[in-house]
Each structure stands twice: as structure tokens, then as C-alpha cells.
């Protein structure tokens, strides 16, 4: 739930309090690693877990862990509980890791993300916020507890919305501001794939989707981000030249 407010409409939010970054509530939604280990140990004790607890944790952690909702709770990263239960629902009966590590039910609504990308495009900034995030895996900003809809395109509000959508999490501090980062491989894959689809749907330029898909997969799973942006740059240059020739610019 995002804290977008309508200042010109009485919404009732003036009697509420935003607990999103209160360290006392960091662990209220999700599983701590101790809780995940206890759960796996139980299934191991009743002979339902095919692998060792540490082995299964090693598989789950990069995909489902690393959510933090307060700068004072960096020592207490949380697992997404829905993702953990999705994994166990497949792993326990089949005795193997699911082929698809991502539950479709947790995917951010595509239309929401497409709207965010359009907002990002309209900002007119020298460097796209989303491009900065997918390039570096992190960004700095201030998490806003509330902001009106008409101010959504302001950088800190935009980054805050990505945080409230679960696409960014608190990683620490940098330059006196909050360091926000992509939490795990699930969100990384989700963000990359939706970016590609949104750019394609917006008809910003046409791409060889098979080739781009391979580059994006390499970026998501192996961290090879440079070839993706080199491909974008070459296609932008090529297609801009064609458009200028056609339009006589």
C-alpha cells in the first residue's frame, strides 16, 4: 500500500500513523532466518525435507531474503513469507527445487509498473532513476511517509513509491540519506522483465526480443548488466538515425 494522499479530499489519513519504517514492526510481516530455519528443521525431523537445512537456506536466501523496513533494523533482514511458503509448497512434495522460483501471485501489477516507467520518462532528468537502479542495484533517497499524487514524479517520492511497492528495500545509509537497493533475485528478475515489456509496449523503439531476453537473463542471474545497456545504446543510435533520415531531420 502506497502513502499517496489527496490533499484536496478528506481521506481520513490525518488520524492515521505510518508505521512502515518503525523498527518495532520490522519483523511483523515476513519470516526471520531463525523462523525459516526452525520451519525447515521441523520438516527435516519428520523426514519431509530432502536436503539439509543449510543447503535449502542457501537456495532460498538469494531469492527471498533481504527485506528491511527500518534503518535501525539492518541486523534483522526478513524473508518474504509468501515466497517461502510457495517454495516449500513445491519443494516438500516433489523433493526438488521448483523450476520457477517466483510465485506469479507476488508479481507487482504490470500496469502499475508501466505507469511508473512512464512517470520516470516524463521527469526529464539527465539520468533515469530506474536505469540508475537497474545499473547499480541501489540508489539513495529519503523515504516519504506521505505525498500527494501530483508530486509523484519528484525523485524522492518516486523512489519511495518503488520502496512501498516492494521493488526496493533499505540497505543502509549513504551520504546522510537512506540507501535503497533491489532486495533479491526475485525482485531483480521481476523489475528487469517488466522494464523490458514496458519499454516494448510503449513503442519507444523496436528490439530483437530473443536477443534482449538472453542479455536480460544474463544480467539478472549473473550480474552482466553492461551488454544490456550497450545493446540499448546501439539500437537507440541506429533507430534514431533511421528516424532522422525518414523525417528529414
Indicate where each model-derived feature is located.
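Phosphate-binding site recognition
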Residues: 1-249
